[in-house]
């Protein structure tokens, strides 16, 4: 697989070199960002998203990709500022909250003093919580697979953050919710590794 990634990097750089920046849709910018992120070209993916935002102002998905690429490149602080602006602008979606929580989680992991660790753990839990409660998992039907998958990510991460913040009751509560989500996914035919691992 790594050989395939190495082969595609030059092709993607060439694709960006000849990319029609003025006429391309936000969807085309987004797709190129996704391709670049998939092969580890995080800084170039960020540049693509930022360029796309010059032509497609306030495109939520491009903002998310720019921040996600920065986070992957090791700049969670800058990524968190971008995502905080999205939230302040009214974006209450699961994806934005989860990306922001993930940036806070990275800052928590990178922190060396206990005050910073506590602060970023609390921020991550709060944002994962916002993402999780955007759609109450209790109201989701097994047939709503995509929504269930979307709910799983913030839910299991709340459990993770509670566990490493020594709140074992909170960790257990959200681990159980994540397990129930996986049961619903499995009953709907979803049988990926992370569903089995959670159960």
Could you tell me what each predicted segment is?
Residues 50, 84, 105, 109, ...:
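Alpha-helical repeat scaffolds in large eukaryotic proteins
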Residues 42, 139, 183-186:
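Long, compositionally biased charged/polar accessory segments in the mid-to-C-terminal portions
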Residues 18-24, 41-42, 46-58:
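Internal amphipathic alpha-helical repeat/solenoid segments
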Residues 18, 52, 85-86, 131, ...:
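Canonical positions in the second alpha-helix
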Residues 2-13, 34-47, 69-84, 115-129, ...:
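Helix-turn-helix repeat elements of alpha-solenoid scaffolds
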